[in-house]
Curated annotation (Swiss-Prot):
Pathway: Amino-acid biosynthesis; L-lysine biosynthesis via DAP pathway; LL-2,6-diaminopimelate from (S)-tetrahydrodipicolinate (succinylase route): step 3/3. It comes from Herminiimonas arsenicoxydans. Homodimer. The gene is dapE. Its EC number is 3.5.1.18. GO terms for biological process: diaminopimelate biosynthetic process; L-arginine biosynthetic process; lysine biosynthetic process via diaminopimelate. Transmembrane segments: none annotated. Keywords: Amino-acid biosynthesis, Cobalt, Diaminopimelate biosynthesis, Hydrolase, Lysine biosynthesis, Metal-binding, Zinc. Its cofactor is Zn(2+); Co(2+). This is Succinyl-diaminopimelate desuccinylase.
Length: 375
């Protein structure tokens, strides 16, 4: 059994449902410390984070990831227990197999091989690992990034091990992500008997034209890296629970996935302008869970694309599609951030898995990336 496969199975067996780490990072420290990494555990509100660094020189290449996994869902629907790593039909099954314990194992083994082969490499290597990526993500990577920024540690490159590949290993690198901004809109009416609408004010009826306009609005055209900004309603709550009562208010939750062609302030102003145009009495609270980030084609993406081509023969594509990731925090302190990992077709699903044939090539790609940047 390859070392990467063995370590992947070790990590899957640790039932680290978010925000638990369940000893995953302790195992990583056991492996990294003998290589010369200075390992620091940073805890915050029940979340375990690891910052490990070998060397003090620039450039600093960081590998980032998360040890937490999403809940299993109904256990009786799994073909084999989710925290018992099981191989069958050329695949390794278990929660976290694709997202993202294989990536972490591959990164660590790649670093071990690289350090042993090139003890006098230039620059430094770092690991930023959290147990709070699948949850609120308020006490994980963002906490470590703030600590690194406060003490002036400069990151030059970062590879996040998210499962970015689509069909085969290496077909997609994420070089950015859209931002995410949510709004909670409360439209106020006047509650009353449904038979006497003239004595009430129905907020659902009132807000319908405004919602239709928001749905139809073209927020931007996107750009060469991003799809256009999208606006979607996620929840709508109104009514007193009776069929003969006009509600006093309606609450609408919505979300923007926005690209660099728009700004937070600009989107907010346009929403308020539409609501005001329709004469609504309303309250609107905003929350931003991430700003868009983008690493244009350059030394990091080129180094990884070359590593992928050398190992797999696949010509990779750069993409910014998908949801948010911890890359949004790292991009605030690191000029070049990309995400790369195994195929994502089974992530968060029952019977999550990775094809065994991809495991060692993934490790080799991470190692070749180190060689391209630090030799």
């Amino acid at each position: 059994m390859s070392k990467t496969l063995a370590l992947t199975e070790e990590l899957i067996a640790l039932s680290s449902v978010t925000p638990e780490d369940k000893g995953c990072q302790s195992r990583l420290i056991e492996l990294l410390s003998p290589l010369g990494f200075v390992c620091e555990t940073i805890e915050s509100d029940g979340v375990t984070n690891l910052w490990a660094r070998k060397g003090t020189a620039q450039p600093l290449l960081v590998f980032a990831g998360h040890t937490d996994v999403v809940p299993t869902g109904p256990l009786d629907q799994w073909t084999s227990p989710p925290f018992v790593p099981t191989q069958r039909d050329g695949k390794l099954y278990g929660r976290g197999a694709a997202d993202m314990k294989t990536s972490i194992a591959a990164m660590v083994v790649a670093a071990e091989e690289f350090v042993h082969a090139h003890p006098d490499h230039k620059g430094s290597i770092g690991f930023l690992i959290t147990s709070d990526e699948e949850g609120p993500a308020t006490d994980g990577t963002v906490i470590v990034c703030n600590a690194l920024k406060a003490r002036g540690e400069q990151l030059d490159y970062c590879v996040v091990g998210e499962p970015t590949s689509s069909d085969v290993l290496g077909d997609t690198i994420k070089n950015g992500r859209r931002g995410s901004m949510s709004g909670k809109l409360t439209v106020k009416g006047i509650q009353g008997h449904i038979a006497y609408p003239q004595l009430a004010r129905n907020p659902i009826h009132q807000c319908a034209p405004a919602l239709a306009e928001l749905v139809a609005e073209k927020w931007d055209d996107g750009n060469e890296y991003y799809l256009p900004t999208s606006w979607q309603v996620s929840n709508m709550h109104g009514g007193a629970g009776a069929s003969n009562v006009i509600p006093g208010n309606v609450v609408i939750d919505f979300n923007f996935r926005f690209c660099t062609a728009s700004t937070v302030e600009g989107l907010q102003q346009r929403v308020h302008a539409i609501l005001d145009k329709h004469g609504l009495e309303y309250d609107l609270k905003w929350s931003i869970s991430g700003y868009p980030f983008l690493t244009p084609k350059g030394s990091l993406s080129d180094a990884m694309a070359d590593a992928i081509k050398s190992e797999t023969g696949v010509t990779t594509e750069l993409s910014t599609t998908g949801g948010t990731s911890d890359g949004r925090f790292i991009a605030q302190i690191c000029p070049q951030v990309v995400e790369f990992g195994p195929p994502n077709g089974s992530i968060h699903k029952i019977d999550e898995h990775i094809e065994v044939r991809f495991i060692d090539p993934l490790k080799n790609i991470y190692r070749h990336t180190m060689e391209n940047l630090l030799l």
